[in-house]
A protein has these predicted regions:
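A glycine-rich helix N-cap at a beta->alpha junction
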Residues: 12-34
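Conserved mixed alpha/beta catalytic, RNA-binding, or beta-rich assembly cores of soluble enzyme
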Residues: 21, 41-123
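Short Asp/Glu-rich motifs
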Residues: 11-12, 96
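Short internal beta-strands
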Residues: 1-6
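Active-site charged/polar residues at nucleotide-handling catalytic sites that mediate phosphoryl
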Residues: 37
Length: 123
């Protein structure tokens, strides 16, 4: 199953896709999704995630929260039950919180995503 937002409509026509609304999911809705589909892993590819202030910043440091469904909230919850993988290249992606010690260097990076994962990969 693919879990994304409506900005990715029709990207996966042959795969069951759930669309997270921009306002996010309740705790009960998140639990229902995880209990229904019982994922064997969680994979985030180049997905913007929250920084320490709860903001979603693009690669230029611009806040894009109004265009970003909080899929990372479901990722955090799911990562407690199955291995998680995050692929990113700018520090603002889900999973890059695993590199917090490096990304905390403000001379090199703006506010990075704080959501870690089990297996982060740099693209």
């Amino acid at each position: 199953i693919i879990i994304t937002d409506h900005f990715c409509d029709d990207y996966f026509p042959d795969i069951k896709t759930l669309y997270i609304p921009l306002e996010g999911l309740s705790n009960e809705e998140s639990s229902m999704i995880l209990n229904t589909y019982k994922p064997i892993c969680h994979l985030s590819i180049e997905r913007c995630g929250q920084n320490a202030e709860g903001r979603y910043l693009n690669a230029r440091g611009v806040d894009i929260k109004e265009f970003t469904a909080p899929v990372d909230e479901l990722f955090k919850k799911g990562s407690q039950t199955a291995p998680s993988f995050g692929i990113g290249d700018g520090g603002n992606e889900v999973g890059m919180g695993s590199f917090a010690e490096v990304l905390n260097n403000k001379e090199l990076f703006y506010d990075y995503c704080v959501i870690p994962c089990d297996y982060p990969m740099i693209a």
